[in-house]
Amino acid sequence: MNIPMKNIIFPTLILSLLTFTALCRSDSLLVAVSSNFHTPMKLISEEFEKRTNYKIILSSGSTKKQFTQIVNGAPFNFFIAADTETIERLEKLKLPVRNSSFQYARGQLVVFSPREDIDVKQLLMASRDQKIAIANPSLSPYGKASKELLKNLKIWNSQKNNIVSGINIEQAYQFIKTGNVEIGIIAKSQLMRIKNQSEHSYWIPPQNLYSPINQSAVLLTDNEPSMLLQEFFHTNFVLNLIQEFGYGLPNDE
């Protein structure tokens, strides 16, 4: 799937505006956050701002694209990724604050259809031609896990030509939500945001069918607001919120 030029230019302009805003405010914290965690992070930011004198400015996108932006000098203060491997790659480049990374959540996959009262697993396993939306396995940790799930279900080879890849897990969900695709793989955190879940159909596959989606964060600047945000992630408020949005905690088996 070709990505229109506007999809490349527009996020770059947004990042430039966010960066300019953050640089103009000494009390601002520019945070790169994976698209799957954007909604809970907005709530975390609101509470953090109430408890401190610092303003959080969020930039949401795929983890791989944000990695590229950081390597190319984007002045983020804090990076909340959708995996652990990307953080480790940054650490090898000695870009983050030393020994500042931590795992904050464990993601889960859900096979989802907007249709009501259907066997989603059976629909996924069906041999007939059907479009299946997933996040891009090359860009998104959730996409990588989705591909692994389909492989372990022994249907990747038969269905790979029917895959519709979103840039990230949020776009994959939008493909399903708008009716362009009948079924897809989304994050459990997205399912938790859907009102009237009983009007839709979903299947939560066993986590032994794909590698754990361990999600980590890291400080990119050694300053007070970054350290305060790191500490805030370990509070009961944030830990409870993470679970409410369908994530597991780092010590969950």
Whereabouts are the PLM-identified features?
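Sec/Tat signal peptide C-region and signal peptidase I cleavage site
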Residues: 20-26
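Short beta-strand
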Residues: 59, 101-102
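Exported/periplasmic ABC-transporter solute-binding proteins
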Residues: 26-51, 64, 68-74, 81-84, ...
